[in-house]
Amino acid sequence: MLTVDAKGVFPIAPTPFLADGAIDMSSVDRMIDHYVAAGADGCTILGIMGEAPKLDQDEAIGFVARCVARAPKLPFIVGVSAPGFAAMRSLSHAAMAKGAAGVMIAPPPSLRTDDQIVTYYAQAVEAIGSDIPFVIQDYPLTLGVIMTPNVIRRIITDNASSVMLKHED
């Protein structure tokens, strides 16, 4: 399980596709092998760059399973952001059952106030369960949600399962 003691490089993995839109599992294997050979300390999959919204739940779970099976000692963080908490809960539980170390949650673009952002993360933790470690994904240029240092502090203070921040500029 991912903890606050995690450190090192966790590359952001894209999701390779075949011409017909299916996941290119051979390329998944080569990509994960490359990250391991390069000395990655972990790997982040199904984030914004990981084309997660293009996958249905079965495809996402299959991708997680393939990555974890390829490098079972590498901690994988799985993006689980979804339009609703039910889908987030389902993918979080499935990813953890497949061997993920934790999940990553990005705020939806509709959030504007500090209280809305903090409340969203509290609701997300309630939905997925406080036993699942999560990463706060802060990507204001793409999501349009501005998380101030105070908001991030509040999320971390209010949710013990928050173990990492992925800040993107």
Which residue stretches match the model-derived regions?
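Active-site beta->alpha loop and helix N-cap motifs at the rims of alpha/beta catalytic domains
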Residues: 2-146
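Active-site/ligand-binding-proximal alpha/beta "capping" segment
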Residues: 152-169
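A generic local structural motif
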Residues: 30, 149-154
